[in-house]
């Protein structure tokens, strides 16, 4: 059975000896669309296909990196490397095990609806007043938050970044689009909003925003302690279309993301079977 907690409540807790494998897999994730989707999908696979118990924990990325490096969490499936999360990797990378890339070509940047008459970051000052001089961002611990502050400086933008959360940011985007109003947000692909709205990532001629791969990282000793789970993670890859399909299904549903992920797993069983280690 999946348990969901906040990280502050469980730091320092030991691994529980329960379930078929007498082990609980502890996965930490941020409140980001792709992280929610991938983490709940892996929880479904581990529990329903492989017999493990899973404990899910939400936290900011800096807290997650610290907890995984310290061994308080087993896995983090949403590490944007080598660029967006570079400061965290510089601090904790030597203590983490790399379990491969789930998807490549992970794009970050400033995003606007296609009805807006700007195509590049260096054009934003021309509509700064229409935007109330604001860029709608996410949490201050996110790599894209730091990159956006750098973009404001590099492009000398007459804008300030307003921190919020992934859900709050997409809610603001949806409200603006419904009213055909101008808005600029910090965005990334893959994300369900690109499947729902007509959006464009603004050109970045100064190259402030990097392209990354989304990696899975584990605590020290994880591959030795849980080799079957480590092999699952090494095998786990998704196309942008597959991940977008899962993210949209979760966002469209009032059900728990874990239940939606389970339904997606059953509808894509051949794909899931290709990830599961076979003896």
Residue ranges and their predicted role:
Residues 78-91, 175-200:
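A ligand-binding cleft/hinge motif common to bilobed small-molecule-binding domains
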Residues 42-51, 128-161, 266:
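Ligand-binding cleft/hinge of the Venus flytrap
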Residues 240-279:
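C-terminal functional modules
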Residues 32-33, 55-67, 161-172:
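Short helix-initiation/N-cap motifs at beta->coil->alpha
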Residues 107-117, 212-225:
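A bilobed periplasmic-binding-protein/Venus flytrap-type ligand-binding module shared by bacterial periplasmic
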Residues 24-40, 60-61:
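Extracytoplasmic "Venus flytrap"
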Residues 94-141:
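A conserved helix-loop-strand patch within extracytoplasmic ligand-binding domains
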Residues 1-21:
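Gram-negative bacterial Sec-dependent N-terminal signal peptides
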């Amino acid at each position: 059975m999946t348990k969901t907690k906040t990280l502050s409540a469980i730091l320092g807790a030991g691994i529980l000896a329960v379930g078929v494998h007498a082990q609980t897999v502890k996965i930490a994730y941020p409140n980001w669309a792709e992280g929610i989707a991938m983490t709940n999908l892996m929880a479904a696979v581990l529990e329903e296909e492989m017999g493990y118990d899973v404990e899910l924990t939400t936290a900011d990325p800096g807290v997650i990196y610290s907890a995984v490096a310290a061994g308080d969490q087993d896995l983090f499936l949403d590490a944007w490397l080598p660029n967006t999360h570079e400061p965290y990797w510089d601090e904790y990378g030597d203590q983490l095990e790399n379990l491969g890339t789930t998807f490549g070509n992970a794009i970050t940047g400033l995003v606007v609806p296609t009805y807006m008459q700007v195509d590049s970051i260096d054009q934003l000052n021309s509509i700064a007043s229409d935007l109330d001089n604001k860029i709608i961002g996410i949490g201050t611990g996110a790599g894209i938050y730091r990159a956006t502050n750098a973009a404001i400086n590099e492009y000398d933008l007459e804008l300030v970044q307003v921190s919020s959360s992934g859900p709050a940011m997409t809610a603001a985007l949806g409200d603006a689009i419904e009213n055909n109003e101008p808005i600029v947000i910090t965005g990334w692909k893959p994300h369900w909003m690109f499947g729902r709205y007509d959006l464009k990532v603004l050109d970045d001629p100064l190259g402030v925003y990097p392209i990354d791969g989304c990696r899975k990282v584990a605590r020290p000793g994880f591959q030795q302690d849980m080799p079957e789970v480590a092999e699952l993670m090494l095998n786990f890859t998704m196309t942008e279309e597959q991940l977008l399909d899962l993210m949209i299904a979760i966002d469209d549903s009032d059900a728990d993301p874990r239940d939606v992920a389970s339904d997606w797993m059953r509808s894509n069983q051949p794909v899931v079977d290709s990830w599961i280690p076979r003896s």
